[in-house]
From Swiss-Prot:
Official protein name in the record: Trans-aconitate 2-methyltransferase
GO molecular function, a single term: trans-aconitate 2-methyltransferase activity
Subunit structure as annotated in this protein's UniProt entry: Monomer.
Entry EC number(s): 2.1.1.144
Subcellular location: Cytoplasm
Species per Swiss-Prot/TrEMBL record: Escherichia coli (strain K12)
SUPFAM superfamilies in UniProt: S-adenosyl-L-methionine-dependent methyltransferases
CDD domains: AdoMet_MTases (cd02440)
Amino acid sequence: MSDWNPSLYLHFSAERSRPAVELLARVPLENVEYVADLGCGPGNSTALLQQRWPAARITGIDSSPAMIAEARSALPDCQFVEADIRNWQPVQALDLIFANASLQWLPDHYELFPHLVSLLNPQGVLAVQMPDNWLEPTHVLMREVAWEQNYPDRGREPLAGVHAYYDILSEAGCEVDIWRTTYYHQMPSHQAIIDWVTATGLRPWLQDLTESEQQLFLKRYHQMLEEQYPLQENGQILLAFPRLFIVARRME
């Protein structure tokens, strides 16, 4: 599991794209020229940006070679760069930085967010959506299984929180719109939940394990999911998925 799997990621493309659609709807810009899609993945969010601003120069950034290859194939009119978000520098100041479900993987948000704001033109917008599910059973159980099986903690850190991000971005000279939403995704089985998180949050826990260790981990994880996520009357499972949204406009 050394690289991201675009096919597995896109298995839930509608559910993953919905937050991007709702984030984009809150971006208060009519005309933009330069746009960066940070953590563009296979290009599903980049496609939304291109649909809204077909004349814009859009650059997608991702550290995964597989994701970049998929995005280039899907959107040949956009530019895609394989790079670390923290180190990438645009050639010119940007009108919009769009980051859908990517910045949660990076540390030091107290430094990262002001840095991203500095890449914007005056009146430019930083639009961010991050999963806020560190305390949800899906992610708590990852840590519990790893502890049971004596594996090191490989999960990401929790988000800084609404009040912290408001202060960070206000102090960086932004007008801030911030909100939190919980989606309830209908899952047909507990295995479907595993399929979902295997493409994202579970990757760090599995990537250094042998095949037999992965099987043991996933078997125990499945057992614990069954205890935490009961079936609805129709046999479906409701997967609660909180997400944090930020639209910050640079006022300086």
